[in-house]
Each structure stands twice: as C-alpha cells, then as structure tokens.
C-alpha cells in the first residue's frame, strides 16, 4: 500500500520542532550562508575606488594642461604689453623729435625773414649776434638757432644752442658734456674751430667764444653729479682773449652754490691742448688731464676731461672734475657752460 506524501502543514510542524529542539544548528546554517554579501560589497568598493582614482588622475592632468596654457597665454600677453609700451615710447620719442625739429624750422624761417629785412646800415643794437639778441626779438624757445654772418667782422653763419629758460634765458651754450659720445682730447685747431654735436656734447670753438665775449659777458657753469644733485657757478666779466693771446681766460667775481670756486685758479691762464702746451707747469697738463683747457699747474677743475660713466666716475684724475665740490677723482655726469651779456634784461 502506497504511503501519502507529507503535506505542507506537516513540514511546517517538523521545522518548528527542529527549531525548538536544535536552535544552534539553525544559527550555524545562517552563519554559513551570510559571508557572500560582504565579499561582494568589498569587490564593488574596490572597483569604485579605482574609477575615482582614474577620474582624479584625469582631472589633475587636465588641470595641469590648463595651468600650462594659462602660463603660456600670460607670457604672451606680457610680451605683447611690453612690445606695445616699447612702440609707444618710440612713437613718443619720434613725436618729440618731430615737434622739436618743427619748432627749430619755424625759428630758422623767422630768423631768415629778419635777415632779409636787415640792411647794411643797421646799428649793432639791431643785429642778431647771440642768443640774448634773439631773446629780445621774442624768440623764447630753447633749441638750435643759426646766427647770421657778420659782414662787418667777417664772421660766418654760426649754429648755436640757446637756453631761453634758465635764470631768465638768453644764454648761448659754449660747451656741453652729457653723453660721453664725443672725445674732448683734441688738438689746437679743433678747439679753435669747435667740434661735436650741437644737440649733444660739443665745444663751440675758441674763435667763436672770443667773438661772443668781446662785450661785457657773464659765464654760467652748470653741473650735475651721479646722485642727481645740481650746482652752478656764475662769473661776471668773462672774457676770452684772441688766438694771439692763446685764448687766455679772464674772470670777474664768483657767485653760486657749488661750494668752493674751482675756476678762479685758472683765471688769467692761456688755453692748452695736447699739441700746444701753454700751462704754468713743467708737466704737460693737457696730456696728463686728457683735455683742452685753461690749465695752470695743473687743475682745480677740468671740465673738458674724460667722460667716465657710473662705476668708473670716481677713480681717475683726468675726468670731468670740480675740486670744490667732489674732489679730484669724481667725474661729473653733466656739465654746461653758457654765456650772455652782462646787461641782459629778461
């Protein structure tokens, strides 16, 4: 006889009895089946970490590339700005030069018109003979002018630089040192005729200076050191003798703020050059001090000496010196010598 299969109710009863009778067995069964879930979760976490690391690496690489590109762009912008500034400065310089040349051309045109209006019968008071006479005819802009020839004296046309501003204006500049581009270690003939660039460093020429100082004349010497300090010295009754008198220097009273007067020592001395020694010393001062000047024995000043630049300016005896200010071995940065009539009225 066949047995009937056990019903669901029967199986449920068996399970309950087993649970009550042997609870430890069920716990072992439960513990045996659960570890699969944590292992699965750990594996999933590792994959996510790897993905995150890969994303971070990609972002870091992208950020690095962006930084490099930004640096390149920044350098390019800086270079463009620098180039624009340089171009702007060049344009400003060209514009300034053009304005200066335009002003000088206008001055020359006006002077030529004055020359055309002049006659041989004019008095000396009407003639144009230096920057002070130009000033009195209302030329008030500093710059280059051409003085007309003097038929009575037989002097040729002369290009001069006029200072129409300093201490009332009307000054004719006879010497300038500011760039060091022109050597002042010259011979007698060159100092007689003049040399250099009228807009830069130059010596006007002893013959011209002699002619300009035949009337009572005032001399002004302006100096600048390498620290930017400015000083001046002025002398009344400045006279430069003729060539027969070796362009001898004569000076009157000194005024100024440069300290000790370092030009008075050269008063009443003849002019000397490397090929014509007229000093009052056994030594050949022009060769020792490497300039053309009114050397005595030898100098308290040497305004036509060697131009030494910053760093070399305080080591030599043959520089552009003024002993009463910085001593015998300090070469100045800038010097100008200028003259105008004693009776000049701004």
UniProtKB/Swiss-Prot annotation:
Compartments where located: Secreted
- Biological process GO terms, please? blood coagulation; negative regulation of vasculature development involved in avascular cornea development in camera-type eye; regulation of extracellular matrix organization; response to oxidative stress
Name the InterPro entries on file.
FIB_ANG-like (IPR037579), Fibrinogen-like_C (IPR036056), Fibrinogen_a/b/g_C_1 (IPR014716), Fibrinogen_a/b/g_C_dom (IPR002181)
Signal peptide residue numbers: 1-26
**Top-level taxonomic group:** Eukaryota
Q: Which keywords, in A-to-Z order, does the entry hold?
A: Coiled coil, Disulfide bond, Glycoprotein, Secreted, Signal
SUPFAM superfamilies xref list: Fibrinogen C-terminal domain-like
| Pfam families (alphabetical) | Fibrinogen_C
The protein here is known as: Angiopoietin-related protein 7
């Amino acid at each position: 006889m066949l047995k009937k299969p056990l019903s669901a109710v029967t199986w449920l009863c068996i399970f309950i009895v087993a649970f009550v009778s042997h609870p430890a067995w069920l716990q072992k069964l439960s513990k045996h089946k659960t570890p699969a879930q944590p292992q699965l979760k750990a594996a999933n976490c590792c994959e996510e970490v790897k993905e995150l690391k890969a994303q971070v690496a990609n972002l870091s690489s992208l950020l690095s590339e962006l930084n490099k590109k930004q640096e390149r762009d920044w350098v390019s912008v800086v270079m463009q700005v620098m180039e624009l500034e340089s171009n702007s400065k060049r344009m400003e310089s060209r514009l300034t030069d053009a304005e200066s040349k335009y002003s000088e051309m206008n001055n020359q045109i006006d002077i030529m018109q004055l020359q055309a209006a002049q006659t041989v019968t004019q008095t000396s008071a009407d003639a144009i003979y230096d920057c002070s006479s130009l000033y009195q005819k209302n030329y008030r802009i500093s710059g280059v002018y051409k003085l007309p020839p003097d038929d009575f004296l037989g002097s040729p046309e002369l290009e001069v630089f006029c200072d129409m501003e300093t201490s009332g204006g009307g000054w004719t500049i006879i010497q300038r040192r500011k760039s060091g581009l022109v050597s002042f270690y010259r011979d007698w003939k060159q100092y007689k005729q003049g040399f250099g660039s009228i807009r830069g460093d130059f010596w006007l020429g002893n013959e011209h200076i002699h002619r300009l100082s035949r009337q009572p004349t005032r001399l002004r010497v302006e100096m600048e050191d390498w620290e930017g300090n400015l000083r001046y010295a002025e002398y009344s009754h400045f006279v430069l003798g003729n060539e027969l008198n070796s362009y001898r220097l004569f000076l009157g009273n000194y005024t100024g703020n440069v300290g000790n007067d370092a030009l008075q020592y050269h008063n009443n001395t003849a002019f000397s050059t490397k090929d014509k020694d007229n000093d009052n010393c056994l030594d050949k001062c022009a060769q020792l001090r490497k300039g053309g000047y009114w050397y005595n024995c030898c100098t308290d000043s040497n305004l036509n000496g060697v131009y030494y630049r910053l760093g070399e300016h305080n080591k030599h005896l043959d520089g552009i010196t003024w002993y009463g200010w910085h001593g015998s071995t300090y070469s100045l940065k800038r010097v100008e010598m200028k003259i105008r009539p004693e009776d000049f009225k701004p």
